[in-house]
From Swiss-Prot:
Single GO term (MF): UDP-N-acetylmuramoyl-L-alanyl-D-glutamate-L-lysine ligase activity
Localization in the cell: Cytoplasm
Annotated source species: Streptococcus pyogenes serotype M2 (strain MGAS10270)
Lineage: Bacteria, Bacillati, Bacillota, Bacilli, Lactobacillales
Name of the featured protein: UDP-N-acetylmuramoyl-L-alanyl-D-glutamate--L-lysine ligase
Gene it is expressed from: murE
Record motif L-lysine recognition motif, residues: 404-407
Amino acid sequence: MITIEQLLDILKKDHNFREVLDADGYHYHYQGLSFERLSYDSRQVDGKTLFFAKGATFKADYLKEAITNGLQLYISEVDYELGIPVVLVTDIKKAMSLIAMAFYGNPQEKLKLLAFTGTKGKTTAAYFAYHMLKESYKPAMFSTMNTTLDGKTFFKSQLTTPESLDLFAMMAECVTNGMTHLIMEVSSQAYLVDRVYGLTFDVGVFLNISPDHIGPIEHPTFEDYFYHKRLLMENSRAVVINSGMDHFSFLADQVADQEHVFYGPLSDNQITTSQAFSFEAKGQLAGHYDIQLIGHFNQENAMAAGLACLRLGASLADIQKGIAKTRVPGRMEVLTMTNHAKVFVDYAHNGDSLEKLLSVVEEHQTGKLMLILGAPGNKGESRRADFGRVIHQHPNLTVILTADDPNFEDPEDISKEIASHIARPVEIISDREQAIQKAMSLCQGAKDAVIIAGKGADAYQIVKGQQVAYAGDLAIAKHYL
């Protein structure tokens, strides 16, 4: 429960309070109301709900519906003049985060918090950390792929970083379940829209940076994207940073006065020898490591997670066992066809991660290589040119472009846009299952491979704003082995 006096105090301390308006006019103080629930969904309110009117598409009609269900007061940046009191604020999203934090009893203070950011590798690194910490502790995890609040049951995540009301409710459940640590992926969007406003992480990890999520409804420029990524560093007590990433010198200057550790080529923490399923490291993680996920970049993700977990109480033995146990749904899943050709299923969904994926496969498969790829609709439009550029640099690839969450766009138009950046013919088969089936039918021997990129373990396609049932790349590939 939270009282009106408590929430006004929170807003005033954050300099985010304008006034309370009701039929009697302006009020700096207000009393007599308390709330047992928080919501930003007008369909889920009653007389004991504190409602947040948020979003560019919010309509007064939503508020009218809530009032008919008993709503007594709402928080907003706008007075909709509907006859009930409104707490006016300058920034509704910041208000949501701080009020949710207090409402749920500040659960962040009862957990050790580890956050990963980066253009790629967040989910893989989070899974590595989860398995490392699980050896001696009770970690919860919020990832793009799956979320677990008790370490036993997992459910599909809706957002990389949950909305603040959901985030703190889930954190509180983690505390109730006796969890000791929480591992999170923190996206640039989470900072852009203040989902983690006011939250300080025990350790923040910056894996890498390359252009992505740049478009009309995301970040307008790379500078804006990079800036919002860096906010994790400002909001972490200690940081772990990849010294091999672009703009590392800038980041090193930024964190000079913080507790920090670097890994990679310009640091003391490096991978010294690398095999397909093992590596050796020097520095704080000196030793031999077995790993199920192939690719040097996955070994670097393991290093990043290991250095972070070392700061959070994990032993070197915990880290070695955790790395050896880690598998990630939809990340570098490898199947073998009856004719011994390989099928790689991976979530690679931007130019940089696609380049990494192709390089790993080409290292091991030297025959005919088939690539199945699409790009999502109505987001990240810059990826389409990036995909074309990467494909153009791999002339040995036979490419079939297909649907990948087309949303409100025509998947064929998206494929044509990607194709316009490739200086050789490619095939377009918008039905994703048909594209996979055809590619697999063209592989004939152990040196051949099909690479199915983009959706990973997602068992749906986003079409016209809805999740439409889709068997999933892995399930379809298994069917045609």
